[in-house]
Amino acid sequence: MAELEPISVIVTSVGTEQQAVEISEELVARGLATCINVIPCLRSIYRWKGKVCTDSEYLLMIKTRSALFDTVAEAIRDIHSYELPEVLEFPVARAEHHFHAWVAAMATGVPDPEGEHESEPELNYD
């Protein structure tokens, strides 16, 4: 079995569903993420500028190739409304082989604005 390129889950949180969708669609369209789960109804408690704050947020779980972390983080910072967005990388120690291959193949870092690659690349599951 061929060794696959490392993948990661990158996590960020946002204050609105609209921003969660905006960031998710942008990252996928730019080829920076294969799949993003948007998890609603988080409660975040944190210290900011000398005060304890509590907010409702949406969590984004971004699946991508590990090599794209810096580019994904920069894209999130460019789009995000927060002054200091959370951007954390969790390298995936193990994943089901076919899923791993799909994430690695689809997160190319290259946008597909014309939909030229409407079908997924041929994946070798051996």
What kind of feature is each model-predicted range?
Residues 1-126:
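Positively charged, small/polar-rich N-terminal and surface patches that mediate targeting and assembly
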